[in-house]
Swiss-Prot record:
Involved in chemotaxis. Part of a chemotaxis signal transduction system that modulates chemotaxis in response to various stimuli. Catalyzes the demethylation of specific methylglutamate residues introduced into the chemoreceptors (methyl-accepting chemotaxis proteins or MCP) by CheR. Also mediates the irreversible deamidation of specific glutamine residues to glutamic acid. SUPFAM superfamilies: CheY-like, Methylesterase CheB, C-terminal domain. It catalyses: [protein]-L-glutamate 5-O-methyl ester + H2O = L-glutamyl-[protein] + methanol + H(+); L-glutaminyl-[protein] + H2O = L-glutamyl-[protein] + NH4(+). HAMAP family: CheB_chemtxs. This is Protein-glutamate methylesterase/protein-glutamine glutaminase 2. GO terms for molecular function: phosphorelay response regulator activity; protein-glutamate methylesterase activity; protein-glutamine glutaminase activity. NCBIfam families: PRK00742.1 (NF001965), PRK12555.1 (NF009206). The lineage of its organism: Bacteria, Pseudomonadati, Pseudomonadota, Betaproteobacteria, Rhodocyclales. Its EC number is 3.1.1.61, 3.5.1.44.
């Protein structure tokens, strides 16, 4: 029998510690071995027993979560999940934590905390399982969860009417899908693109209200414009549109232009936004005029959509295992036969630029 994933929860709220521990206890493959009310107590306990995964808050007494995380990553790199407030200050600190090496985010509201965390128990379990599989070396350069949601396909969001994909034209676009480790991977890719890069549509699995700040942060770092997508936005050269957290994003055709349709809907592959929803819509409306890229992430969201893009004539790329934080989504896309080429993260910007020049 495989060893259990040993978890330490560090949060100054006794309620958060209790509810997160209860959620994790529902998975027989996870064991909460320690809890601590602040990083100082946590460091003392970690001298005796080091966890496989940390779940930590950002704002804590005596030492904040960012300082704690940086100390841990310098001394003994450990997969870490951030449990942060949805408040703007908390969200900004969360991106700093992701940059410092945290693997993923669990959001918590200021009001209705207990009921929210109970409802999000599956997300908590998934985040810890994903973190336990993380390749932390990729950040710096498979059991099923006990609680299952119905796993819907992208058919639930996409119309079933016939539509002939366009023959290859000069209107090219790039579609990117990613999850765990994706915030760092997207930054590494987008910051290396020139302002003349093809139009880009992106799904990054991320909680609601975080995507706008994430896009704003990237926009300040990139030559291209980066922003959270709005319904009806045109896909234009030099612009990257990121699907809003909690909403699906689909490509549509409006006359001679590509536009995005941002809409609510069910969880697809247990995600909203879903990479499959985006990729399958790109296959349907762009066909051979698209480049699809699937990057680091746990699970199989995007694998079917990439296969449909490939079959529609699009060029497809998967990030390779060595540079992925979690080699899940790319692996599943490769298994389905939907990937033309695999490459390390550092080569993806060049592939996008080369694709744009070939158009």
């Amino acid at each position: 029998m495989a060893d259990k994933i040993k978890v330490m929860i560090v949060d100054d709220s006794a309620l958060v510690r209790q509810v997160v521990a209860q959620a994790l206890a529902s998975d027989p493959g996870i064991e909460v071995t320690d809890v601590a009310s602040d990083p100082i107590f946590a460091l003392q306990k970690m001298k005796v027993r080091w966890p496989d995964v940390l779940v930590i808050d950002i704002e804590m007494p005596r030492m904040d979560g960012i300082t704690f995380l940086k100390k841990i990553m310098a001394e003994h790199p450990t997969p870490t999940v951030i449990c942060s407030s949805l408040a703007e200050k908390g969200a900004q600190a969360t991106f700093e934590a992701l940059a410092a090496g945290a693997v993923s985010i669990i959001t918590k509201p200021k009001i209705g905390l207990k009921s929210f965390l109970e409802d999000a128990s599956n997300d908590i379990v998934q985040a810890v399982r994903s973190a336990a599989r993380a390749n932390l070396r990729a950040l710096s350069a498979s059991a099923n969860p006990a609680i299952n949601r119905p796993k819907l396909s992208a058919d639930a969001m996409l119309s079933t009417g016939s539509h002939r994909a366009l023959e290859r034209t000069t209107d090219q676009l790039v579609a990117i899908g990613t999850s765990t480790g994706g915030t760092q991977a997207l930054e590494a890719v987008l910051t290396r693109l020139p302002a003349t890069a093809p139009g880009i549509v992106i799904v990054q699995h991320m909680p609601e209200k975080f995507t706008a700040m994430f896009a704003e942060r990237l926009d300040g770092l990139c030559q291209i414009e980066v922003r959270e997508a709005r319904n009806g936005d045109r896909v234009l050269p030099g612009l990257a549109l990121i699907a809003p957290g909690g909403r699906h994003m689909m490509l549509k055709r409006n006359g001679a232009q590509y536009v995005v349709d941002v809409a609510d809907g069910p969880l697809i592959n247990r995600h909203k936004p879903s990479v499959d929803v985006l990729f399958r819509s790109v296959a349907k409306f762009a066909g051979a005029n698209a480049l699809g890229i699937i990057m680091t992430g746990m699970g199989d969201d995007g694998a079917r959509g990439m296969k449909e893009m490939h079959d529609a004539g699009a060029k497809t790329i998967a990030q390779d295992e060595s540079s992925c934080v979690v080699f899940g989504m790319p692996k599943e896309a490769i298994k389905l036969g939907g990937v033309d080429q695999t490459m390390p993260l550092q080569q993806i910007p060049g592939a996008i630029v080369g694709y744009g020049k070939s158009c």
